[in-house]
Amino acid sequence: QIVGFDVDLAQALCKEIDATCTFSNQAFDSLIPSLKFRRVEAVMAGMDITPEREKQVLFTTPYYDNSALFVGQQGKYTSVDQLKGKKVGVQNGTTHQKFIMDKHPEITTVPYDSYQNAKLDLQNGRIDGVFGDTAVVTEWLKDNPKLAAVGDKVTDKDYFGTGLGIAV
């Protein structure tokens, strides 16, 4: 069963418009192609509204302001500079991956099909950090005192756009 903020919001929208909606779990980098080839009717998956994506699909008005955050083991790293030469997990095909590759090429990005898998590898010491949506990783911090934010929130609109929207 798929759970989370986006699913809860999508279910509320479906109820509001009296529609029967089905949900599927897909790799993030397959979402826009699935929409373009009409395998799905809408995508609601924490997707940043960026100029690059707006060239491919339409978006609703943003439903959530977005930022990103690095997370690592508690007490190990306090600044992003300390992650130079380290392995940081990202969800494959996301703006987080592009941001690190462009702005922090000295950090080794490790792509994952889901943030949950990146989180597991972080907790088990296979990677040094994860870079993801602030809303997602903040929940991890609440649930796991062994994890901590590394540096400040990142709000670069060139990468994280004008917020999260529903792609249609």
Describe every region a protein language model picked out.
Residues Q1, A10-A19, H96-S114, L141-P145:
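Ligand-binding cleft/hinge of the Venus flytrap
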Residues Q1-D8, D81, T155-D158, V168:
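Short, solvent-exposed loop/beta-turn-alpha elements that line the ligand-binding surface or hinge
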Residues Q1-G46:
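Extracytoplasmic small-molecule ligand-binding "clamshell" domains
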Residues V7-D8, T22-P33, G75, V110-N124:
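Short helix-initiation/N-cap motifs at beta->coil->alpha
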Residues L13, L35-K36, L83, L122-Q123, ...:
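Hydrophobic residues within well-ordered alpha-helices
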Residues D18-T20, K36-A45, K87, P105, ...:
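Alpha-to-beta junction loops
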Residues T60, G72-V88:
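Flexible hinge/capping segments at coil-to-helix
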Residues Y64-V71, T134, L141-V168:
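Periplasmic-binding protein-like
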